[in-house]
Structure formats: structure tokens, C-alpha cells
Amino acid sequence: MKKLTLLISILSFCFILNGFAQEAKVKWYTFEEAVELNKTEKRKIFIDVYTDWCGWCKKMEASTFANPIIANILNTEYYAVRFDAETKDTISFKGKQFINVGGKSRSPHQLAVALLQGKMSYPSVAYLNEENQFITTVPGYYSPERLEPVLNFFAEDAFLRQSFQDYVSQQKTTN
């Protein structure tokens, strides 16, 4: 009987963990969907600029974006976009057509070049405000622990009042 109770407890725990794991998924939008949604419910836009050959991009997708805290912040404070920097799709934004003019393997899309201001480094995250205006680009891999304060810094509009270093220092003293 004890073994049966233990087995049921373990299975119940696994189902609970599975439920939490499902809730921890980031709701990803296309760039166009995020811009369209922003017309009716204003949020900042988080754009993960990646390539399919980038190892750090894959690590960030598998670890950072799978973190339930990160997923929750992205799902509630942002429209999260995963943007393939080498896509062949034509994207309309602010009355302009963005395309991939290179036509070769690994040629960057014009929108990726614009978002990253010509500094083609992967992974990178571009942030747009609620009016779809560029805020900044943050290049490089970020673990969940490093990304969380960055997400909050922009979500809370703290970037309008103080440097990121001051924001992080202030958070440490209040926690």
C-alpha cells in the first residue's frame, strides 16, 4: 500500500510539474502580429534576433526563454517576437518594405540590419516602445538571471530615468 501511495504521489507531482512547464512557454508572435496587436493593446516589443546556425541563439531559446519567470515577464509585459535575421520574407513596417537583398546563404534581412543598427551579432534583442519606436539593442547571450533585470528595466520605463547600473544597484538595496 505504501508503494502504491508513493507511486501516486510521484505521478501527481510529475503532472503538476508538467502543468507548470506548459505555463512557462513564451507566446511568440511574428513581427507583423506584434505591431498589429500594439495598435489595440499597447506594450513594448521584445525582438529576439537570431539565426538557425547560431549556437548561442539555440542555447538562449532552450534555457533562457524556457524559464518560467522570463516567460511570464515576456507574456505579460511585451509582445515577444522571434525574428530570423536571414528570413526571405518581405516585411512591411512604417510604410517601408524590408527584404533580404543578399539572396545568398547567411545574408541578413534589411529589418535585422535596421534593428541591430548594422552590428550583426547573434543573438541580439531589440526593444521597441509602445509606439513601435526603437529603444535599443542588447547583443549577446543572456541567462535567465541576467535577462530578468534587463526585461524589468525596460518594462518599468526605468531606462527613461536612470542607467541600467543604477537600476540594478537600486534593486539590490530594495530586495
What spans do the regions from the language model cover?
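Short active-site neighborhood of thiol/selenol oxidoreductases, capturing the structured segment around
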Residues: 41-55, 80
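Detector for the c-type heme attachment site
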Residues: 58-62
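A short beta-strand-turn-helix
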Residues: 27-44, 74
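Extracytoplasmic/secreted cell-surface and envelope-processing proteins
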Residues: 56-57, 135
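Sec-dependent signal peptide cleavage junction
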Residues: 18-33, 161-175
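A conserved hydrophobic position in a structured secondary element of the catalytic/binding core
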Residues: 49, 65, 83
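Bacterial Sec-dependent N-terminal signal peptides
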Residues: 1-23
